[in-house]
UniProtKB/Swiss-Prot annotation:
One of its GO terms (molecular function) is RNA cap binding. It comes from the Eukaryota. This is Nuclear cap-binding protein subunit 2. Coiled coil: none annotated. Transmembrane segments: none annotated. Component of the cap-binding complex (CBC), which binds co-transcriptionally to the 5' cap of pre-mRNAs and is involved in various processes such as pre-mRNA splicing and RNA-mediated gene silencing (RNAi). The CBC complex is involved in miRNA-mediated RNA interference via its interaction with Ars2 and is required for primary microRNAs (miRNAs) processing. Also involved in innate immunity via the short interfering RNAs (siRNAs) processing machinery by restricting the viral RNA production. One of its GO terms (cellular component) is nucleus. MRNA binds at Y10, Y33, R102, V103, D104, W105, D106, R113, Q114, Y115, G116, R117, Q123, V124. GO terms for biological process: mRNA cis splicing, via spliceosome; negative regulation of viral genome replication; primary miRNA processing; regulatory ncRNA-mediated post-transcriptional gene silencing; siRNA processing. It is found in: Nucleus.
Length: 154
């Protein structure tokens, strides 16, 4: 494998199975995790970009688990491993909606994984962010709650 398609060190802590089963699933998978998306990026934009590398079987958009709105990630599944490898090689680190996107191997989509795992419903990384990122909802969610103006007029 070339460096661009090697497995990263990230492992899904909610994976049902042993570490070696997860490694095997990642090495055989044709599913990719796509991160650092704008909350405004559409499924159509993702399909247009990723279909340049092969036939996309399905795209599952990541959603805020409470609001059911996009929260900056998705899963892209191809029909073959070779197509997914091409996407890892050519799409990882490219720009989509003025954002550098991250592409990583995924062991395969399981129902429920489309929802953010953060306390506020979105992604954990967006809860603690201290910078302002308009494409990902402004300031981090937990920071925004702490600095929200007093609206009860006291």
């Amino acid at each position: 494998m070339s460096a661009s398609i090697d497995l990263s060190s990230y492992r899904d802590q909610h994976f049902k199975g042993s570490r070696s089963e997860q490694e095997r699933s990642l090495r055989d998978s044709s599913t990719l995790y796509v991160g650092n998306l704008s909350f405004y990026t559409t499924e159509e934009q993702i399909h247009e970009l990723f279909s340049r590398c092969g036939d996309v079987r399905i795209i599952v958009m990541g959603l805020d688990k409470y609001k059911k709105t996009p929260c900056g990630f998705c899963f892209v599944e191809y029909y073959t491993r070779a197509e997914a490898e091409a996407a890892m090689r050519f799409v990882n680190g490219t720009r989509l909606d003025d954002r550098l996107i991250r592409v990583d191997w995924d062991a395969g989509f399981v129902e429920g994984r489309q929802y953010g795992r953060g306390k506020t419903g979105g992604q954990v990384r967006d809860e603690y962010r201290t910078d302002y990122d308009a494409g990902r909802g402004g300031y981090g969610k937990l920071l925004s709650q702490k600095i929200a103006p007093n609206t009860d007029n006291r």
